[in-house]
Design a protein with these regions (language model features):
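Small-residue (primarily alanine) positions within well-ordered alpha-helices
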Residues: 17, 21-24, 34, 44, ...
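Residues that line or immediately flank small-molecule/substrate-binding pockets and catalytic motifs
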Residues: 50, 84, 108
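Short, basic and Ser/Thr-rich N-terminal targeting/leader segments
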Residues: 28-32, 78
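Short beta-strand scaffold segments in enzyme catalytic cores
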Residues: 32-40
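Short beta->alpha transition motifs characteristic of CBS
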Residues: 43-50
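Helix-adjacent hinge/juxtasegments
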Residues: 58, 62, 66-99, 103
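Zinc-dependent deaminase
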Residues: 1-24, 95-188
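Residues at secondary-structure transition points
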Residues: 4, 8, 12, 30-31, ...
């Protein structure tokens, strides 16, 4: 981790990552967004797509790396900066190191799987063949708020669905009793 003073340009790119994360949320995915920049220009963007694509590796960072590799026709993404709303997990940290991204800037720490200093730090591991500068905390509260609002809404939806399922089951049981039939209601 570094004690870095963020620039106005850093803030612009992180705000874009927050916007990109909204696309993930629209698709029912965890709202994490990533923007890869080279020489002050966005070369790729990615958002979480794991659920919809049935692909555990389709994290925002990986999606952005894949697009950049195709655009630049090279998996080595030298002299690039990745802005991501949530601290990279171990898988994404490994991909970022392997692709040689020079700088990673993340907003919110990942208290469960953060691999850039919160839980572990793969970027400072002696096992790493490549190194990257990692800076954290840029627009942290906005990134954190976006994720927390999503999970609060998701928990409420799950709770409501369970409540509806219980009511339907109770109605079916009452219906069975009233008709003196020994059958099980079909929940579909």
């Amino acid at each position: 981790m570094s004690d870095h003073q963020f620039t106005p340009q850093d803030e612009i790119f992180m705000r874009r990552a927050i916007e990109v994360a909204k696309q993930a949320e629209k698709e029912g995915e965890v709202p994490v967004g990533a923007v890869l920049v080279k020489e002050g220009e966005i070369i790729s963007e990615g958002w979480n797509r794991s659920i919809g694509s049935h692909d555990a590796t389709a994290h925002a960072e990986i999606e952005s790396l894949r697009k950049a590799g195709q655009a630049l026709e090279n998996y080595r993404l030298l002299d690039t900066t990745l802005y991501v709303t949530l601290e990279p997990c171990p898988m994404c940290a490994g991909a970022l190191l392997h692709s040689r991204v020079k700088r990673i800037v993340f907003g919110a720490p990942d208290l469960k799987a953060g691999a850039a200093g919160t839980v572990l730090n793969l970027f400072e591991s002696q096992a790493s063949y490549h190194y990257a500068d990692v800076e954290n905390g840029l627009l942290e509260q906005e990134c954190r708020d976006q994720l927390q609002a999503f999970f609060k809404r998701r928990r409420k939806e799950i709770k409501e669905k369970r409540k509806q399922d219980r009511l339907l089951e109770e109605q079916c049981l009452e219906s069975d009793k009233a008709s003196n039939k020994n059958k099980v209601c079909n929940k579909k």
